């Protein structure tokens, strides 16, 4: 099976915890704090690999987590950084955040790397919290949690030219005659169930990658047949070869076939309607009907498209098509990768949000406050006091009071619960 979609979970490594330690050595009076910092968590990085051509591996492994940073230790020793996790994906993979659809990366080049989930920073050891009023602080930070998110992966094959047309128009025969690709060929619809790629040599004019796009029928843009699954693979192409059954061996009108397929392309993505296209009028070896329909094709589309009579089965006319395609490709620009949207205007997030859960308890959300709570040693009184000061400076205490919190109420922040008291 050909898998071009996957949903996976990734998480950057958590930062290592900072250490609470005191220096206790002979001849060193008032040794003071000596706790080291935690190491930075590892990143989850995707790397494009041209040796891969499917997302099938992600059917069996869906969770990817980088190594956490090492914890700080006494004697002011810092923990080691966590190892980054490299995840190989096929070239042509588009990475989006599953919840929002936000584009994160479009990996087009072999070896291209993108950090998908950053590791958390290491927590600071208590050596950082010494002051004139607190020379032996029992304050340190736990490691910052690494970024985590669910991703939608979508593979769009990378080819210079796409072969489009109705089932049984002869696309698979075409690609098998001009390249080393060996698609399944049979006399029934939907023989081809996966996009087949082949490298085509045009002599001195160079070579190009050709993709046989299967499953295009009327209604494909709305999911009819297999077209909805494979139309995305036309997006990377720079030029389209529209293969049509000129002889009408399947009982269809070749003129209407071209109109239908082009309408489906435009409905799926209006940009495809402007993609350069040539018509390969196939099955010209079946006469006289093919010759009559060729004249109709030229009358209907001659001013809009270049039309080449061919017979893929007998190799008739294929060389002319290939050399013309190579000439056109030399004049066409490369398809640019999708770019993540950039915020034009900076809009600061609210520092926190307060709401009441269905059970009557309070829930506080916000990246900053949740990070502070996650990085606090709540079992240490001094660390807890520091967190309370931070909450007060952020305005959280006043916010809860204004929201109506009462003594004894439970306030949830992240994974922790606190009982409200005066």
Curated annotation (Swiss-Prot):
Transmembrane stretches in the record are: none
Which positions does UniProt annotate for GTP binding? 165-172, 190-194, 212-215, 282-285, 311-313
A molecular function (GO) term: magnesium ion binding
Q: Which part of the chain is the OCT domain? A: 344-422
Q: Where in the cell is it found?
A: Cytoplasm
State the EC number(s). Answer: 3.6.5.-
What's the chief localization of this chain? cytoplasm
What are the required cofactors? Mg(2+)
Q: Which CDD domains match?
A: Obg
The record's listing under InterPro entries reads: G_OBG (IPR031167), GTP-bd (IPR006073), GTP-bd_Obg/CgtA (IPR014100), GTP-bd_prot_GTP1/OBG_C_sf (IPR036346), GTP1-OBG_CS (IPR006074), GTP1_OBG_dom (IPR006169), GTP1_OBG_dom_sf (IPR036726), OBG_GTPase (IPR045086)
Stretches of the chain forming a coiled coil according to its record: none
Task: Give any Gene Ontology cellular component.
Answer: cytoplasm
> Entry's PROSITE patterns?
G_OBG (PS51710), GTP1_OBG (PS00905), OBG (PS51883), OCT (PS51881)
Domain OBG-type G per the UniProt entry, residue ranges:
159-330
- Read off the Pfam families from this record: DUF1967, GTP1_OBG, MMR_HSR1
| Biological process terms in GO annotation | ribosome biogenesis
Q: Which residues bind Mg(2+)?
A: 172, 192
User: What's in the keyword line of the UniProt record?
Assistant: Cytoplasm, GTP-binding, Hydrolase, Magnesium, Metal-binding, Nucleotide-binding
Q: Into which EC class is this enzyme placed?
A: hydrolase
User: In which domain of life is the source organism classified?
Assistant: Bacteria
The entry's family comment says: Belongs to the TRAFAC class OBG-HflX-like GTPase superfamily. OBG GTPase family.
Q: What does this protein do?
A: An essential GTPase which binds GTP, GDP and possibly (p)ppGpp with moderate affinity, with high nucleotide exchange rates and a fairly low GTP hydrolysis rate. Plays a role in control of the cell cycle, stress response, ribosome biogenesis and in those bacteria that undergo differentiation, in morphogenesis control.
Q: How does it assemble?
A: Monomer.
Specify the protein name. Answer: GTPase Obg
């Amino acid at each position: 099976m050909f898998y071009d979609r996957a949903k996976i979970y990734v998480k950057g490594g958590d930062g290592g915890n900072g250490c609470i330690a005191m220096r206790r050595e002979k001849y060193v009076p008032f040794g003071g704090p000596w706790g080291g910092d935690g190491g930075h968590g590892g990143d989850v990085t995707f790397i494009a690999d041209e040796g891969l051509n499917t997302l099938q591996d992600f059917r069996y492994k869906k969770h990817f987590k980088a190594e956490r940073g090492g914890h700080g230790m006494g004697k002011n020793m810092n923990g080691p950084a966590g190892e980054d996790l490299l995840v190989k994906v096929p070239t042509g993979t588009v990475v989006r955040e599953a919840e929002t659809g936000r584009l994160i990366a479009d990996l087009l080049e072999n070896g291209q790397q993108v950090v998908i989930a950053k590791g958390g920073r290491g927590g600071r050891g208590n050596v950082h919290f010494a002051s004139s009023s607190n020379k032996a602080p029992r304050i340190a930070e736990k490691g910052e949690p690494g970024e985590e998110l669910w991703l939608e992966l979508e593979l769009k094959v990378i080819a210079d030219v796409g072969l489009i047309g109705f089932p049984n128009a002869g696309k698979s025969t075409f690609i098998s005659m001009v390249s080393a690709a060996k698609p399944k060929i049979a006399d029934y619809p939907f023989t081809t169930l996966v996009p087949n790629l082949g490298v085509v040599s045009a002599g001195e004019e160079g070579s190009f990658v050709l993709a046989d796009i299967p499953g295009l029928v009327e209604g494909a843009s709305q999911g009819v047949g297999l077209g909805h699954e494979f139309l995305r693979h036309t997006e990377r192409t720079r030029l389209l070869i529209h293969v049509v059954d000129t002889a009408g061996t399947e009982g269809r009108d070749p003129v209407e076939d071209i109109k239908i397929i082009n309408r489906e392309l435009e409905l799926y993505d209006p940009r495809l309607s402007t993609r350069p296209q040539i018509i390969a009028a196939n099955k010209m070896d079946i006469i006289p009907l093919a010759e009559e329909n060729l004249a109709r094709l030229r009358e209907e589309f001659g001013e809009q498209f270049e039309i080449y009579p061919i017979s893929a089965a007998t190799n008739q006319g294929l060389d002319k098509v290939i050399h013309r395609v190579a000439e056109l490709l030399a004049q066409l620009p490369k398809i640019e990768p999708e770019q993540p949207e950039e915020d034009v205007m900076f809009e600061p997030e609210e520092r926190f949000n307060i709401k009441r859960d269905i059970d009557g308890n309070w829930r506080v959300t916000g990246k900053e406050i949740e990070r502070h709570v996650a990085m606090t040693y709540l079992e240490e009184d001094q660390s807890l006091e520091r967190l309370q000061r931070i909450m007060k400076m952020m305005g959280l205490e006043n916010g809860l009071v204004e929201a109506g919190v009462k003594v004894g109420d439970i306030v949830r922040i992240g994974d922790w619960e606190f009982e409200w008291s005066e």
